[in-house]
Amino acid sequence: MRESILIFGGKNLKEMEEDGGIGWWYVNQERAENLEYAVITRCLTQEWATHDVEQGTAIMICKLTGMVDKAIDSNRKCLRFSSYAKINIPNAWQKMTNSQRNPFKYIETNK
């Protein structure tokens, strides 16, 4: 079974590129290194979030590299990606997670 990750985040592409990837999350290192894709969905709850689409809209799918950077001062991880495609799928977060509170969810890639 191949896995990907669904992320509920507020950053835009430029901010992710400045971070060096999709970060910073408390994910399992070994599991994160084997993820295929990340689907980014928009979270608008933070003051600094990019307000470009409705809450929960899937905005981007990223091909992950398997490279995971660890923050110096915590166990948070940043997932590097090699390519991406912009998408616009309203309510993706709500539909795929039942609006769960945890800001990411591992998903089977083929589902």
Model-derived features with residue positions:
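Structured alpha/beta reader/binder surfaces that contact nucleic acids or chromatin modification marks
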Residues: 1-111
